[in-house]
Amino acid sequence: MKHPLFNQKVLAGFVSMLLISGSAFASNNEKSEMTKPKGAVGTGVALENQARTNQFWWPDQLNLSALRDHDKRSNPYGENFDYAKAFNSLDLDKVKLDINALLTTSQDWWPSDYSNYGPFFIRMTWHSAGTYRTLDGRGGAGGGQQRFEPLNSWPDNASLDKARRLLWPIKMKYGEAISWSDLIVLAGNVSLENMGFKTYGFAGGRHDDWEPDMVYWGPEIEMLASDREDNGGKLQRPLGATHMGLIYVNPEGPKGVPDPLGSAKNIRVAFERMAMNDEETLALIAGGHTFGKMHGAHKPKDCLGAEPAAAGIEEQGLGWKNKCGKGHSEDTITSGLEGAWTQAPTKWTSLYLSNLLTFEWKQTRSPAGAIQWIPTDESLHKAVPDAHVKGKFHAPVMTTADLALKYDPEYRKIAERFLADPEEYRLAFAKAWYKLTHRDMGPSRNFLGKEVPKESLIWQDPIDDKTQSNIDADGVQELKAQILKSNLTVSELVRVAWASAASYRHSDMRGGANGARIALSPQKDWSVNNPAETAKVIKTLKAIQEDYNDSLFSKSKVSLADLIVLGGTAAIEKAAKDAGFTVSVPFNAGRGDATQAMTDINAFSLLELTSDGFRNYFDAQQSYKSPVDMLVDKADQLNLSVPEMTVLVGGLRALDANYKGLKHGVLTSTPGTLNNDFFVNLLDMSTVWKKSSTDGIYEGFDRQSGHKKWTATSVDLVFGSNSELRAVSEVYAFDTSKQKFVEDFAAAWTKVMNLDR
C-alpha cells in the first residue's frame, strides 16, 4: 500500500529536475559533450558534481561510515560542554510554566485543536521515543533524531515539523540548558499534566545529536511499503515497525486490510520489540488515544506538498504544505484518518476504553479515503465536538488497530480490568509512558532533574549500591597477584572480561561490566560466552573475592564486577610482559553487583549477541548481516573508531581470545602473548589465501611450499582485503609499531571496560 502523504511525484520531479537541468556549475554545452563508455545504458549521469560513495560502485563494499559518524567536531557547543551541568542549572518549573502557556496560546500559522496543543505534543513525544527497538537498542528519544532525515519526513510524522516549530521559542529562550531531545519529551509530559493526568516522572540527560543516525530502518525503497516479513510472516530482525515510515503498525490494518485480529498480531510484535508487554501496550495505546484527534480532512494527493526533506528551500525545513481550504484547522491532513476517539479530547478520562468496549462499530472511510470505524448507533454520531468549528459535532472513531484491543482476547481482558479500575489504568499508563520515553537512557544514574522517581525500575538494570568496590591501589595489586596465581589462563581471563564488558550497547546504554550480570541468567548461558568456561572463571574469581573481602587485614571490599575486569587487566599486562613489552592497563574500581532479582531475564535476553567478530563468533541463523558487517555493527555499539576496532581484533587474536579457543585468525606462534603478529602475518605476501570446503572459513598456504599455515574467517581477512582497514593494519604491522600496538590495544581495551560508567 502506498501512502498518499509521501509525495512520490514531487520527489521524482525534484530528482528529474536535477538530472535534466544539471547544476549551476555545468553548462548545457558541457553536458552535450559528455560521453559514456561503449555499451553503457542510460544517461550515465546520477547527480552532477556530486561525489559518489564506494557503495555506489561496489554495493558489497564494507561500509565503515558508522565508525566515523557523530564526530565531536559536529557539535557546535564544543568538546568541553557539560550538558549535565547545564541542565542541572535549569529552573525546570519555569520551563514547564512556559510550555503550559504555549499549550493554550494558539498560533494563526498552525492553530491548535480544541484550543490546546497538548495532544499534538503528546504525538510528537510518542513518535520521538517510539522508534526505539529492543533487538539492537536503536531509535528512541535520545539525540533528538526526529529533527533529521529520514524521521522528520516519515509519513507517520506528518505535521510534527510544526510541533517542533511551536516549541522553538522555548528552546531559543533556554538554549543549551535543555536539549531538543529533553524538551520534546518534557513537552509531552507537561501536556499530559495540563490535561489532568498525573505523570510518573521525568528525567533529563539526553544529549542532542547534530546529524542523522545511520540506522537500518528496513529493506523497502518506498515509504509505507512493507516487505520485511519472512515466508512464515515473522518480522525481520532487528526491525520493530511493520512498514517503512511508520512508528509501529498500519492503523488501517495489516498492509491496509481491516482485520482487527491480524492487527493485534502486528501490534503485539511491534510493542514486544519495543520492550512492552501486553499490559503496557494496552495502557499506552488507550492512554495516548484518549487525547486529540486524527486528521484526514481531504485526500492528501490532492492537497499536500512534499515532505520536509523534499520541499523547496523556501519552506525552510517545513513540509506537507496544504493547499486545500485553510491549509490547517478543519482542513488539516496528516494520516488521512479523521476524527477523535473520545468525547473529551483534552481531558484524561476512561472514555476511550468505555467507547471501545461498549459501542458496536461499523466500517467507514474518512474524507481522505482511509478505512476507519464509527459506532453503529447513529445517536452517537454527534457526540464529539469539532476541534475548530463551534457548534459542529462528529461521531467518535476507532481505527482497525484500536479495534484489535477489543477483539484480541488477551488485550480485551486487560481493557476490561482497566475500565473497572481507573486508578490501576492511570498508574499503568503513567509507568508505561515513563518507560516509553526513558527506555533508551540506560541506567538511572544517567537520569537528571528533580522529577526523577526515587524507585529504580527493573528495566533500568539496577545495581546494588552496597556492593560497590572501594579498593585502593594496594588492594588492586594484591588482587591482580592472586588472580595470576590461580588456575586461570590469560585467554580465559581475557575472554570472560571481554564478554562481560562487550555486552554494552551504546545505542541504549544497556549491558556492560557493571553489575557482573555475566554471572547471572540469562547472560551466563549465552552461547557466545561459552557457559562452561564462564562458570569456571566466575567460580574462581568468586573464591578470590570472598577470601579478600573476609580477610581480617582487608580494609576494603571488591565487587565481582570489578574483579572480572581486573582479571582481564592482569592478564593483558602479563601477556604484554611475556611478549617483551611493559604496559600499565588503567583500572578504576567502583563497580557494583546486581542480583538475579534485579535482572529482567526476558528484557536482558534481547542483548544476547548473535555475532561478535572480536571473538570470531557468528550465528548465521540469528544474525541479520554478514560477519564483517556485524563486526562493524558491534564496533559501532561499542563506540569504537576504525583504529580501535582494528587494534582490538588484532590483539584479541594474539591473546587467543576466540570463542571456545577456535584458532581461526590466531596468526601467531605464541598465542596468549600480546604482540602484533596478527597484522604482520596477515599482510605477509608469502601467504596465499583460499576458500576452504567449510563455508566461511579460509586457509592460508605458503606460496612456495603449499604448506597450510593458518585458518581464518572473513572477519580476519577483511583487515587485509578492505583498503581502509588494510591501511590501518599496515600501521600496526610496522617494525616500529610494536610498542604502539600494545599501548593502543590497552587504551582501546580500557575504553570498552568503562563504556557503561
Swiss-Prot record:
Summarize where heme b binds, as residue positions.
Answer: 289
Any idea which UniProt keywords this protein has? Heme, Hydrogen peroxide, Iron, Metal-binding, Oxidoreductase, Peroxidase, Signal
Site (Transition state stabilizer): residue numbering on this chain: 123
Top-level taxon of the source organism: Bacteria
Which metal ions or organic cofactors does this protein require, according to UniProt?
A: heme b
Q: What intrachain disulfides are recorded?
A: none
Q: Where is this cross-link: Tryptophyl-tyrosyl-methioninium (Trp-Tyr) (with M-274)?
A: 126-248
> An example Gene Ontology cellular component term from the record?
cytosol
State the signal peptide span. 1-26
The UniProt entry, under InterPro entries, shows: Catalase_peroxidase (IPR000763), Haem_peroxidase (IPR002016), Haem_peroxidase_sf (IPR010255), Peroxidases_AS (IPR019794), Peroxidases_heam-ligand_BS (IPR019793)
Protein name, as recorded? Catalase-peroxidase 2
Which Pfam families would you find in this protein's record?
Answer: peroxidase
Q: How is it modified after translation?
A: Formation of the three residue Trp-Tyr-Met cross-link is important for the catalase, but not the peroxidase activity of the enzyme.
* Main function: Bifunctional enzyme with both catalase and broad-spectrum peroxidase activity.
Its gene? katG2
Residues of the active site: 127
A GO BP entry: cellular response to hydrogen peroxide
Q: Which reaction does it catalyse?
A: H2O2 + AH2 = A + 2 H2O; 2 H2O2 = O2 + 2 H2O
The enzyme's E.C. designation: 1.11.1.21
